[in-house]
């Protein structure tokens, strides 16, 4: 149990780390000159697709300050592809993974995206890495039209209710803050029967995206929100807390990440607020539980969301450890493994000539199960990242402050009884 809790906490830290040339269009179909009575395949395969292999790649920080994240992340991707390749590949093709080291630098990331797509001729991006690089290149990725599976960040630009056209090739897996904000409201209503919800959110992208998601779901459910904004990293949030307290809400969303959430929780306790709080998976770490456990004791509970369930993933963890023995307990390698899995599941579904359009169709054709978590459904252009999340709360784990599991992975529909 202690090992699992430690890994879960480390997975939350992944998000904190992850907190140009002419564009090449997708290959066009070539008209066939074969007589109609002898139909043959006339589609040309997409770039990066060969008779015996399919080439994919990414740029990630494998040197510099973020190398401890980027190196195992890519190792996880490579381990998954090695497993697939040694079993014969996908439809007779091995998966070849190429990589550029962008050092977490958005300028280098833009240049390396150009190299990967136009020089290396990759079929798809797998594991586009880091908030600054993804933020700087997301429009370029869309302009190329290349499929991009798994982003090591949760920025709001990845979210789309119905992706079409140039937006369609974006396939996020990690939680996106906008989706998480919606799930927080679904938990508040479904689990805690809240009718009036307070939201304290920071004025940075994370806080605004969480609040945006909460607003959308509250409007859909006809639930009242009372919201107060605070400065990210603020040391005094007393005014916002007083407003929420006086509004007599049923439940509170702490839409802030590590630098601010302890201040919010401590001030709620100081003002003797007795309403439970829920916060983002990014905060589900020992550092946060240790910071607030003494202040909240007996006053209210602090809950956090999560996107993996290692306690019920023993077989998947054993398979991961077999193929990535040097990284068997490394959470960054686990996320790379997840990235490799999602790409491969889409590829397995493609029939006939492998094109970008067919691959996108394949990813949208049915939900895909996270080997360590819930399912993600890309149907009808849904690009929401993780859509099933579990629940834990601050408490004692092995006589130390930690996060105690409360409820398993559930979708918003399940939480709301739909």
Label the model's feature ranges:
Residues 327-333, 344-401:
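Segments of small-molecule ligand-sensing domains
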Residues 18-29:
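Bacterial lipoprotein signal-peptidase II cleavage site
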Residues 1-4:
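Positively charged n-region of N-terminal signal peptides that target proteins for export
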Residues 121-228, 276-297, 301, 310:
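Extracytoplasmic ligand/sensor domains, especially the bilobed periplasmic-binding protein
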Residues 268-337, 411-413:
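Extracellular/periplasmic periplasmic-binding protein-like sensory domains
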Residues 41-50, 57-78, 100-107, 129-130, ...:
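Extracytoplasmic "Venus flytrap"
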Residues 44, 68-75, 87-161, 229-238, ...:
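Beta-alpha junction/loop-to-helix N-cap segments that form part of ligand/metal-binding clefts
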Residues 27, 35-58, 86-94, 189-195, ...:
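Immediate post-signal peptide segment of exported/extracytoplasmic ligand-binding proteins
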């Amino acid at each position: 149990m202690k090992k699992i809790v430690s890994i879960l906490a480390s997975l939350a830290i992944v998000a904190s780390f992850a907190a140009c040339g002419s564009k090449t269009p997708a290959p066009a179909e070539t008209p066939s000159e074969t007589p109609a009575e002898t139909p043959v395949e006339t589609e040309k395969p997409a770039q990066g697709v060969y008779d015996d292999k399919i080439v994919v790649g990414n740029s990630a920080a494998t040197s510099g300050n973020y190398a401890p994240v980027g190196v195992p992340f890519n190792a996880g991707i490579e381990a998954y592809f090695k497993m697939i390749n040694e079993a014969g590949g996908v439809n007779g093709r091995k998966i070849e993974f190429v990589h550029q080291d962008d050092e977490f630098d958005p300028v280098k990331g833009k240049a390396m995206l150009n190299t990967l797509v136009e020089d290396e001729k990759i079929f798809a991006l797998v594991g586009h890495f880091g908030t600054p690089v993804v933020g700087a290149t997301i429009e370029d990725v869309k302009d190329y039209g290349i499929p991009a599976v798994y982003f090591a960040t949760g920025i709001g630009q990845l979210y789309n209710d119905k992706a079409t056209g140039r937006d369609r090739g974006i396939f996020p897996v990690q939680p996106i803050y906008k989706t998480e904000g919606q799930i927080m409201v679904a938990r508040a209503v479904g689990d805690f029967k809240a009718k009036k919800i307070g939201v304290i959110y920071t004025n940075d992208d994370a806080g605004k995206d969480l609040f945006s998601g909460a607003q959308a779901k509250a409007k859909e459910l006809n639930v009242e929100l009372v919201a107060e904004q605070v400065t990210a990293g603020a040391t005094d949030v007393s005014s916002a807390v007083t407003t929420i307290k006086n509004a007599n809400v049923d439940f509170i969303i702490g839409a802030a990440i590590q630098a601010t959430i302890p201040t919010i929780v401590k001030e709620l306790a100081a003002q003797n607020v007795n309403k439970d709080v829920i916060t983002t998976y990014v905060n589900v770490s020992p550092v946060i539980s240790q910071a607030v456990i003494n202040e909240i004791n007996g006053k209210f509970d602090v809950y956090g969301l999560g996107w993996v369930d290692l306690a019920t993933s023993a077989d998947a963890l054993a398979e991961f450890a077999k193929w990535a023995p040097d990284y068997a307990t490394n959470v960054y390698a686990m996320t790379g493994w997840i990235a490799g899995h999602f790409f491969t599941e889409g590829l397995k579904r493609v029939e006939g000539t492998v094109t970008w359009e067919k691959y996108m169709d394949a990813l949208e054709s049915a939900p895909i199960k996270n080997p360590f978590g819930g399912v993600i459904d890309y149907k009808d252009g849904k690009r929401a990242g993780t859509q099933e999340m579990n629940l834990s709360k601050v408490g004692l784990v092995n006589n130390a402050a930690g996060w105690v599991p409360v409820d398993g992975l559930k979708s918003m529909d399940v939480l709301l009884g739909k």
